[in-house]
C-alpha cells in the first residue's frame, strides 16, 4: 500500500468505475476488503477490541463485509451495522455478505452500545453516492463521527469518506470525518482538494494488484 498517494496520478470516479469494469474478472472486492482489514488491524491494535463497521447498500458495503469477515477471523469483536437490503445488493456485494454470514457473522441494524470502540469503519457509500446522505444513513454518519470523537478512536473510511465528492472535494451535507482513508486502485482528486483533507485524514492507496495507468489515462 502506498502512503504517499498525492505523488501519484489521480483519477476521476468515472475512470475508476471504468477500470473496475475492465478488471471485472479479478477479485477486486476481496482484495479491497483484505487491504482494509490489514490497515484496520494496524490502527486498532490488539485483537479483541470492539470494531464498529457501517456497511451500505452497494459495493462499498461489500468491501466492508469482506473486511468484517477477515477481522472476525483475527479475533476482533466485530459489530457490523448493515444499512441496506440484502436482496438488492449488487452481485459481488451479495457474495461478500453471504460469506460473512457463512463465517458466523451476524449483521445488525442499529449501533449497539459498547464500553469502548477501538475502531470505526465507514463502508456506507464511498465514491458511489451522487446525492446528499439522508435518513437512516445520515443518522449513521452522525453517530459514527460522534462515537469516534467520544472514544478517541480511529475512523477509517473505505475508498472515500461517505458524503464527500471524490472528484471535487466538497461535502454533500452530512459527511464522515475520517482520521484515515484507504482508497482503492488509485487516488481521487477530491481527497486532496477542497474539503477533502479535513475529512479524509491520512490517505493510503491500495492498488489491488492493478496498475491504473495501464487501463485508463489519469486525470492529473
Where are these regions (language model features)?
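An N-terminal, well-structured beta->alpha segment
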Residues: 1-52
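Nucleotide and nucleotide-moiety/phosphate-recognizing core
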Residues: 37-126, 132-158
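Charged, low-complexity, helix-prone segments enriched in Lys/Glu/Asp/Gln
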Residues: 18-21, 93-100, 218
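YjeF_N-associated NAD(P)HX repair module
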Residues: 2-17, 23, 117-220
Amino acid at each position: 500500500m502506498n502512503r504517499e498517494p498525492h505523488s501519484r496520478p489521480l483519477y476521476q470516479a468515472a475512470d475508476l468505475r471504468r477500470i473496475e469494469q475492465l478488471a471485472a474478472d479479478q477479485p477486486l472486492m476481496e482484495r479491497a476488503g483484505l487491504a482494509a482489514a490489514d490497515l484496520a488491524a494496524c490502527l486498532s491494535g490488539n485483537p479483541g477490541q470492539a470494531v464498529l463497521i457501517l456497511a451500505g447498500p452497494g459495493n462499498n458495503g461489500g468491501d466492508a463485509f469482506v473486511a468484517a469477515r477477515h477481522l472476525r477471523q483475527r479475533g476482533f469483536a466485530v459489530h457490523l451495522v448493515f444499512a441496506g437490503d440484502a436482496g438488492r445488493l449488487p452481485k459481488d456485494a451479495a457474495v461478500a455478505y453471504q460469506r460473512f454470514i457463512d463465517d458466523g457473522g451476524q449483521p445488525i441494524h442499529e449501533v449497539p452500545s459498547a464500553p469502548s470502540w477501538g475502531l470505526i469503519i465507514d463502508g456506507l457509500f464511498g465514491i458511489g453516492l451522487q446525492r446528499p446522505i439522508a435518513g437512516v444513513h445520515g443518522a449513521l454518519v452522525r453517530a459514527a463521527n460522534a462515537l469516534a470523537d467520544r472514544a478517541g478512536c480511529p475512523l477509517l473510511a473505505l475508498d472515500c469518506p461517505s458524503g464527500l465528492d471524490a472528484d471535487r472535494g466538497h461535502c454533500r451535507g452530512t459527511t464522515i470525518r475520517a482520521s484515515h482513508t484507504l482508497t482503492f486502485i488509485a487516488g481521487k482528486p477530491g481527497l486532496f482538494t477542497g474539503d477533502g483533507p479535513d475529512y479524509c485524514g491520512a490517505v493510503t492507496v491500495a492498488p489491488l494488484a492493478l496498475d491504473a495507468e495501464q487501463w485508463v489515462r489519469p486525470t492529473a
